[in-house]
Amino acid sequence: MILRKLSLLTLLSVCLSSLSQTSIRLPDIISSGMVLQQQTEVKIWGKATPGSRISIHTDWTRKDISTEADADSTWFLRVTTPKASWHQHVIALRENGNATTQVVLSNVLIGEVW
């Protein structure tokens, strides 16, 4: 009886955790702690479920920009960066507008990259 309950709980937790996972995948170079070039357009790219809508929200523009993942799962967006500062920025990526499956990049700095 205890083993059956334990098996049921394990199965339930696996199912619930898979519901909250996003299919957004980013290359290693795009991550928390990155530095982006100031006052330019930077390319953010990755992979996701084909046909899904990918949106990016930055704390410096406070608006969403979005695109659709291609048949080969790839997507990309260009984001305009602000002037350099010491402020740590946040970029949130969502799939199909779902906030529960978002990918958050924190501690993003804007400055001179050379």
Report the location of each language-model feature.
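Non-catalytic, glycine-rich low-complexity segments
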Residues: Q21-P50, S106-W114
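Bacterial Sec-dependent N-terminal signal peptides
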Residues: M1-T22
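Residue-level detector of functional hotspots within protein domains
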Residues: T10, D28-I30, R94, A99
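A residue-level detector for conformationally permissive "hinge/kink" positions
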Residues: K5-S7, L12, S31, Q38, ...
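Extended acidic/polar, glycine-enriched regions
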Residues: W45, T49-W114
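Generic alpha-helix detector with strongest preference for long hydrophobic helices that associate
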Residues: S7-L8, P27, D72
